[in-house]
Amino acid sequence: MESNISFLIPTLNEEQNLPFALESCSFADQVFILDSGSTDRTKELAVRYGVHFVYHAWVGYAGQKNWGLDNLPITSDWIFILDADESITPELRDELLAISTGKVMTDKTGFYVNRFFIWEGKEIRHCGYYPSWNLRFFRRGRARYEERGVHEHMVVDGPVGYLKGEMRHEDRRGRDYIWQKHLKYAELEAREMVKVISGHAIDGLKPSFFGNALERRRAVKERLWPYLPVRWLLRFFYMYILKKGFLDGAAGLDMCLFMTQYEKEIARKYSEYRKQLHK
């Protein structure tokens, strides 16, 4: 039976993660690996699993995925964007198929999907990282990513819903790699903060203290967070105390401390870029 779903998976050197992602979406009619120059076994794995492998030079997190949505020969009515370090749970698979095959009728254009993180081998169910809603499942031709440097969100033309099934997020490339990735994120986040204070707002997810969870988070990030002192300390208090990271045990504490260091890097880069702005 056809699933009427196509998956788009952006990749760069994902040989350690990709098999888990591909196994989890084997029910799809089409799977497109959109690669930006892997030098490991990513392409070999794509060939082994019999999925489409397409190279496109990196144009940013949002731009890369939007290019794929515009140019890949996707034929399914429904599309799912999956990161290579994520996988679909059986419960989510069944829910997706019920919608895509018409067993469950819906007027929604897109759906938010929750995901849980694996950190140091343990599921994280607190720390402000659960629930973690991401709009990933949508009708073909009805959604695009906002043009943001990092942590971009999907903008959908039509009503949206929320699914019960979850994604699993686990990056298996090691702590050093994850830290280097967050250093890149810190640079991009700092640049986005400078854009906001200089009046160059992006056209995408609208910040609102009275909107949904993502809109509230964006409002805090853009309208409040850049102006607060010792943001790294506030982030630890938020994650470990307010969001009960302590309930996730040693892994929860480790994750909170890791993200505190990440926040310090954002603040350092932000200060650096602001000085450049006023020269």
Model-identified regions with their sequence ranges:
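Short, well-formed alpha-helical segments that are part of the catalytic scaffolds
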Residues: 8-27
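Short acidic donor-binding/metal-coordinating loop in glycosyltransferase active sites
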Residues: 36, 56, 76, 82-86, ...
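A conserved acidic beta->alpha catalytic loop
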Residues: 24, 35-44, 83
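A short, glycine-/small-residue-rich helix N-cap motif at loop->alpha-helix starts
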Residues: 57-64, 87
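Acidic helix N-cap motif at the loop->helix transition within catalytic regions
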Residues: 16-19, 40-49, 91-92
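Cell-envelope/extracellular polymer assembly enzymes that use nucleotide-activated donors
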Residues: 4-6
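Catalytic-site signature of metal-activated, phosphate-bearing donor transferases
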Residues: 63-66, 90-274
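Active-site nucleotide-sugar/metal-binding loop of Leloir-type enzymes
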Residues: 66-78
